[in-house]
Regions:
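An acidic site on a long C-lobe helix of protein kinase domains
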Residues: 83-86, 187, 225-228
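Short helix-capping segments at alpha-helix termini
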Residues: 47-51, 131, 213-214
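Glycine-rich, phosphate-binding/catalytic loops in enzymes
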Residues: 40, 84, 175, 192-194, ...
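Active-site acidic catalytic loop and adjacent metal/ATP-binding pocket
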Residues: 7-17, 23, 142-191
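Helix-rich C-terminal or lid/interface subdomains of diverse kinases
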Residues: 11, 30, 76, 184, ...
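ATP-binding pocket architecture of kinase catalytic cores
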Residues: 2-112, 151
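An alpha-helical support segment within catalytic cores of ATP-dependent transferases
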Residues: 1, 72, 93-159, 247-251, ...
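A general structural signal for well-ordered alpha-helical segments in protein cores
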Residues: 38, 42, 118-122, 188, ...
Length: 261
C-alpha cells in the first residue's frame, strides 16, 4: 500500500483529511461493529504496545465514521530484518496483554472469535473445497479439519497482520493499523504472514524476537495456508470472479508447498 492509497481495503472507505487525520467509514453495514470495537479497544491497548497503533474516535454516526491521527509510512515489503525484529517484539508484547482487561475494553472474547472461525471454516468446506483440483483436495480437507480444533492457548491478537497493515519508513516500523478483526484468539494467526509469507530475513527476525515453540509454528503454517481461502469467499460474495480465481490459485500454491509439512 503506497502512502496515498487509502481506499483499497475490503471493509472500509478510508480518506486522508487535511494531511493529518484518517477517516474510516464502513463499506457495508455489517462492517460497522469492527470500527466500533477499534474505537473502544485501541485507545486503551495502544499505550501497552511498543509500536504505534491508531487511537480512533467516533466523529459521525450518520454515516458512521471514526478518525485517528495519520500514521506515516508505506506498506511493509516484508524483506527487512530490522522490520522483522520490531514486529517480533511487538507480537510478543501483544500476546502477553491481559485478556480479561482487553475484553473489558471492547475486545471480542475467545468464544466469540472461535465460533466465527468455525462458521467460516464450515463455509469454506461447503463453498471452496469443492472448487479445488483433485490433487490438493485431500490436503485442503485435512487443513480444515485441523482448523476445527480449538487453539491450545489464546491471547489478544491483531488477526489480520499482513504487509498492508504494517506501516514503515526506511528501516523503522511506524505503525500497525486496521484492527477490525482483533480479539481474543489464536496467537499463531499473527505469525502466519510474518513468518511464512514474508521473505526469510524478515521472517527469521520475527522468529528470533518472538521465539515461538514448534506447535505454534505448525499452527501458524495452517493459518498461512488458509489465507487465500478467505479471498475465494470474498470473491464468491461481493468481490467477483477475479478474487475467486486469484484466491484459488493462492490456495493451490500454498497447499502444494505446505500441505504435507
Amino acid at each position: 500500500m503506497e502512502p496515498d492509497d487509502f481506499d483499497g481495503g475490503w471493509d472500509n472507505r478510508v480518506t486522508l483529511v487535511d494531511g493529518r487525520w484518517v477517516d474510516r467509514t464502513p463499506r457495508f453495514p455489517d462492517r460497522e461493529p469492527q470500527l466500533r470495537r477499534e474505537a473502544a479497544l485501541l485507545p486503551w491497548l495502544g499505550p501497552l504496545l511498543p509500536l504505534p497503533v491508531p487511537a480512533p474516535t467516533v466523529v459521525s454516526e450518520d454515516p458512521f465514521t471514526v478518525r485517528h491521527a495519520y500514521l506515516p509510512g508505506s506498506r511493509c515489503p516484508g524483506t527487512s530484518p530490522e522490520h522483522g525484529a520490531e514486529i517480533g517484539r511487538f507480537l510478543r508484547t501483544l500476546h502477553t496483554v491481559d485478556t480479561g482487561e482487553a475484553i473489558r475494553h471492547g475486545a471480542r472474547d475467545g468464544d466469540t472469535t472461535y465460533a466465527e472461525v468455525q462458521t467460516t471454516v464450515a463455509r469454506m468446506a461447503r463453498e471452496v473445497l469443492p472448487l479445488l483440483p483433485a490433487r490438493v483436495a485431500a490436503s485442503g480437507e485435512a487443513l480444515l479439519e485441523r482448523m476445527a480444533t480449538p487453539p491450545p492457548r489464546t491471547s489478544v491478537v491483531h488477526a489480520d497482520l499482513g504487509p498492508e497493515h504494517i506501516r514503515v519508513v526506511a528501516e523503522r516500523v511506524t505503525g500497525v493499523i486496521d484492527w477490525g478483526d482483533s480479539g481474543i484468539g489464536d496467537p499463531a494467526l499473527d505469525l502466519a504472514w510474518t513468518t511464512l509469507g514474508a521473505d526469510r530475513p524478515f521472517a527469521d527476525a520475527v522468529l528470533l524476537g518472538y521465539r515461538p515453540d514448534e506447535a505454534l509454528v505448525a499452527r501458524a503454517r495452517d493459518w498461512h495456508q488458509l489465507g487465500p481461502w478467505h479471498e475465494v469467499l470474498y470473491g464468491l460474495g461481493e468481490g467477483g470472479r477475479e478474487f475467486v480465481e486469484s484466491g484459488l490459485a493462492g490456495t493451490v500454491d500454498r497447499l502444494e508447498r505446505f500441505g504435507s509439512s
